[in-house]
C-alpha cells in the first residue's frame, strides 16, 4: 500500500468508525439536545435523564430517539472523515527525529483538523440539531427538503448559521478527544500498565478521552445548539441571540454556570460510548488493513 493510499484509507476508516458510533449514541444525542434547549429564558426544573427519556418516548414514540440520525450519519461521513483522517496527516508534520510527537503538537493537529472539518460540513450539523430539537414532528421531511427550505427561507448563508460555535466546538472536541486518546494510550503502553496494544488499552484510553472531551466541549456545545435552534426574523437575524458571546452571556446571567453545563450528563453519556466505539472500530480497521495503530 502506497503512502497516498494509506492516507486515503485513514480518512475512509475515520468516517466509517464515527458513523458506527453515531448509530449507537443517537438516542443520547437527542436527549442532550433537548436538555440544552430546555429552559431557554425561563426558569425550569431539570428534565432528568430517566424522566427525559420516558417523556420523549411517551409523547413521541421510541422512534423519536433516532430523530436526526440520517443527517447525523451524513455529518459523520463528511465532518468526521475530515477530522479523523486529517489528524494523522497534520500530526505527521510535527514528528521529531525520534519519531515522536509531543502533546502540544497533537492538540494543535486535533484543533486544526476539527475546525476544518466542521467549517466545511456545518450545514449537516444544523439540520441534525433542528430535527432532534423538534418535539412536534420533524421540521423537515428529508435532508434534501431541509436544504431546500433553509435556502429558500434563510438563503445560502442560512446553512452556515451557528458555524462559529460549531467550529469552536469541533476544534475543542478534536483537540481534546483524539490527542488525549493518543497520548493516554501510549503512556499506558510505555509504562507497562497494559503491555499489549489491543482492545483493553483501547477501551481504557477512550473512556478517559470521552470524559476529557465532554468537560471541554459542553459549554460551547450548548451555545451551538441554542444558536442553531433559535427562531430567526425575515432577514435571518436571530431573535434571541446575536452571537456566540451573547448566547454565552445570557445563559450565564439567567441560568448560572450550571446552565452552561446543562445537558452535560447526556453529553458525556453520548461522547463516552461514541468515543469508545469510534476508536475500537478505527483501531480494528487499521489493524486488519495493515496500517500502523494510532
UniProtKB/Swiss-Prot annotation:
Protein's UniProt name? Mitochondrial substrate carrier family protein ucpB
Ranges facing Mitochondrial intermembrane side: 1-10, 89-106, 183-192, 286-294
The lineage's top-level taxon is Eukaryota
Keyword list, A-Z = Membrane, Mitochondrion, Mitochondrion inner membrane, Repeat, Transmembrane, Transmembrane helix, Transport
One biological-process term from Gene Ontology?
response to cadmium ion
Family from the record? Belongs to the mitochondrial carrier (TC 2.A.29) family.
The source organism is: Dictyostelium discoideum
Assigned GO CC terms: mitochondrial inner membrane
The ranges of the Solcar repeats are: 9-93, 101-187, 197-288
Its primary localisation, in coarse terms, equals mitochondrion
GO terms, molecular function: transmembrane transporter activity
Q: Where in the cell is it found?
A: Mitochondrion inner membrane
Membrane topology, as annotated: Multi-pass membrane protein
Q: List the disulfide bonds.
A: none
List residues in topological domain: Mitochondrial matrix. 32-67, 128-161, 214-267
InterPro entries the record matches: Mit_carrier, Mito_Metabolite_Transporter, Mitochondrial_sb/sol_carrier, Mt_carrier_dom_sf
- Function recorded in the entry: Mitochondrial solute carriers shuttle metabolites, nucleotides, and cofactors through the mitochondrial inner membrane.
The regions listed as transmembrane in this protein's record are 11-31, 68-88, 107-127, 162-182, 193-213, 268-285
Amino acid at each position: 500500500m502506497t503512502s497516498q493510499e494509506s492516507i486515503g484509507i485513514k480518512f475512509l476508516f475515520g468516517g466509517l468508525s464515527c458513523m458506527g458510533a453515531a448509530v449507537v449514541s443517537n438516542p443520547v444525542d437527542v436527549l442532550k439536545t433537548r436538555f440544552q434547549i430546555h429552559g431557554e429564558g425561563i426558569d425550569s426544573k431539570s428534565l432528568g435523564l430517566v424522566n427525559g427519556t420516558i417523556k420523549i418516548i411517551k409523547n413521541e414514540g421510541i422512534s423519536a430517539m433516532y430523530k436526526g440520525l440520517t443527517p447525523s450519519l451524513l455529518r459523520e461521513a463528511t465532518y468526521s472523515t475530515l477530522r479523523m483522517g486529517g489528524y494523522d496527516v497534520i500530526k505527521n508534520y510535527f514528528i521529531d527525529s525520534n519519531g515522536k510527537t509531543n502533546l502540544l503538537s497533537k492538540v494543535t493537529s486535533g484543533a486544526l483538523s476539527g475546525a476544518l472539518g466542521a467549517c466545511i460540513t456545518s450545514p449537516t450539523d444544523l439540520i441534525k440539531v433542528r430535527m432532534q430539537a423538534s418535539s412536534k414532528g420533524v421540521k423537515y421531511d428529508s435532508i434534501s427538503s431541509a436544504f431546500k427550505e433553509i435556502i429558500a427561507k434563510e438563503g445560502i448563508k442560512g446553512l452556515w448559521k451557528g458555524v462559529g460555535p460549531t467550529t469552536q466546538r469541533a476544534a475543542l472536541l478534536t483537540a481534546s478527544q483524539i490527542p488525549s486518546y493518543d497520548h493516554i494510550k501510549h503512556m499506558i503502553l510505555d509504562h507497562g500498565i497494559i503491555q499489549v496494544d489491543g482492545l483493553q488499552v483501547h477501551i481504557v484510553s477512550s473512556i478517559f478521552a470521552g470524559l476529557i472531551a465532554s468537560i471541554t466541549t459542553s459549554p460551547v456545545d450548548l451555545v451551538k445548539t441554542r444558536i442553531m435552534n433559535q427562531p430567526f426574523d425575515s432577514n435571518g437575524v436571530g431573535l434571541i441571540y446575536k452571537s456566540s458571546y451573547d448566547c454565552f452571556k445570557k445563559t450565564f446571567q439567567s441560568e448560572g454556570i450550571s446552565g452552561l453545563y446543562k445537558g452535560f450528563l447526556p453529553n458525556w453519556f453520548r461522547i463516552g460510548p461514541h468515543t469508545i466505539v469510534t476508536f475500537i472500530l478505527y483501531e480494528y480497521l487499521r489493524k486488519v488493513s495493515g496500517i500502523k495503530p494510532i
